[in-house]
Amino acid sequence: MFYPDPFDVIIIGGGHAGTEAAMAAARMGQQTLLLTHNIDTLGQMSCNPAIGGIGKGHLVKEVDALGGLMAKAIDQAGIQFRILNASKGPAVRATRAQADRVLYKQAVRTALENQPNLMIFQQAVDDLIVENDRVVGAVTQMGLKFRAKAVVLTVGTFLDGKIHIGLDNYSGGRAGDPPSVPLARRLRELPLRVSRLKTGTPPRIDARTIDFSVLDQQHGDNPMPVFSFMGSADQHPRQVPCYVTHTNEKTHDVIRNNLDRSPMYAGVIEGIGPRYCPSIEDKVMRFADRNAHQIFLEPEGLTSNEIYPNGISTSLPFDVQMQIVRSMKGMENAKIVRPGYAIEYDFFDPRDLKPTLESKYIHGLFFAGQINGTTGYEEAAAQGLLAGLNAGRYSAEKEGWAPGRSQAYLGVLVDDLCTLGTKEPYRMFTSRAEYRLMLREDNADLRLTEVGREMGLVDDARWARFNEKLENIERERQRLRSTWVTPSTASVEEINTMLTAPLSREASGEDLLRRPEMTYAQLTSLSAFAPALDDAQAAEQVEIQVKYEGYIARQQDEIEKQQRNENTLLPATLDYRQVNGLSNEVIAKLNDHKPASIGQASRISGITPAAISILLVWLKKQGLLRRSA
């Protein structure tokens, strides 16, 4: 039977991608349905109990700047907050928070259940309704059919998921949850390229069986960082430390002696695992010169005794896992409460997607998260938001939107996936971005909130706060530009105590702030430049904008030069065999990838600068030279 009411957008899957997609579509005013196999697992952290990190924290801030959920949820659930790379420049500083799994899931569910235009329904999905290469709905396990104008697939590791512990394996979407086999079979019937990937998770340890007294503690930062631009440290629950232990030669001997029982090394697992989150077996074999690996013991929550040993992801048999755990300092009597495992699952080649994350072949069908070959909560959330907003725009018959590489890490992520594809789980790093000085955590709102407001993602409270911040920044910069001191100023001695070289000529507040030794806090502690802004976010922007003004201007020039090619559009229906002068290899690659722009084409492996020049000349001759706005 058909459900009586049609929807604008259906989201299939309630993980980090699905929840952001559902919230985004609903915020835009679209009637949205979130289908999940279990309402109690909405927003569940399937692996590590943490949000953020290098590159990942940047994505979380961007999701927040667009009105998303993840940053707000972790501010209510984070039990240890830190700024990574705090001693380095602002481009690579990143926020990371340990999470209480229960509080995080609770924050996500509360937000979903209170979001207007959003209905949640508990049923696994077995099929899509596709008519004339256009998705028009979904069919649940019990045969109930839902109609919609757009569908977003955010199914994580559930598509034909297979869990491995030692040489034993069984079907599962994750530990304790069934896989999605009928849907996987249905998707394999569509004209989409599909392959397998693998990820893994470590065993969980009973904290009561660990001797923490012999281990080093790792505390969070004080003052505590905040993730959301709308957040406050007052929202954070009680903070707790993590602990550090290490593997040793005994650990490594146990692993080497049991490799024949590893499903990876025995050839049982076909899927490729994440390069930047390798299993402990991989670490020991790939880094044979290392006699120890650092392991972080991370609490799973304030009311839980479970500890997540970050760094020993494994699919070795349970008896070997016990030996590995008990070989480490402080863990000699440790008990495992959940075994580690590896999981294989289907993913679909993201090169078959438009930058909006809509399928090139099935209209109205969007993909987000691990189904696109990524790994990580943050990467999933960012894709989910983008897919959700574009599904909403599609259902409203509006043009899709995707950020550029110079606009957001989300733009880098999507461009990498859609242009280059991936053969291993893709993780975001700051090193993947060419313009990372422009793509900082601290300015994510300045880059994206205005766009989010235009698309209906940003509510009135966030918009008012954003505009207040802009006004504070401009007012303070104007004040510092127009406030001057000279060597004869009465307070010059006070100023000179903070400078490496005495003041020798007239200088404005901005001139002094540009000096490496001067911070905004120091400058505004001087009587000539007091008082400081009460708005800490605006104050941070003032300091960064002034200190890095020259570098930022130079990078902006680079972006503008690159933008000409980036925005030159390529017809979606172009058969590159029509373009004289292109090699057979280039023709094959362009016809295979179908890039949306010259910029995207230039990043395809094997596409030479000469080929790009030929394309530009041909487009001009044919009267097809068009640039996007």
UniProtKB/Swiss-Prot annotation:
The organism named in the record is: Cronobacter sakazakii (strain ATCC BAA-894) (Enterobacter sakazakii)
Keywords for the protein's UniProt record, in alphabetical order: Cytoplasm, FAD, Flavoprotein, NAD, tRNA processing
Any GO MF annotation of the entry: flavin adenine dinucleotide binding
State the Gene3D superfamilies in the record. Answer: FAD/NAD(P)-binding domain, GidA associated domain, C-terminal subdomain, tRNA uridine 5-carboxymethylaminomethyl modification enzyme MnmG/GidA
User: What's the gene?
Assistant: mnmG
Checking HAMAP family in the record gives: MnmG_GidA
**Major location (coarse):** cytoplasm
Cellular component terms, GO, for this chain's entry? cytosol
**Coiled coil: which residue ranges?**
none
Q: What is this protein called?
A: tRNA uridine 5-carboxymethylaminomethyl modification enzyme MnmG
- Please report which protein family the annotation says this sequence is part of: Belongs to the MnmG family.
* Record-listed NAD(+) binding positions: 273-287
Q: Which PANTHER family match?
A: GLUCOSE INHIBITED DIVISION PROTEIN A (PTHR11806), PROTEIN MTO1 HOMOLOG, MITOCHONDRIAL (PTHR11806:SF0)
Q: Any signal peptide, and if so, which residues?
A: none
SMART domains to which the protein is assigned, alphabetical: GIDA_assoc_3
- Name any cofactors this protein relies on: FAD
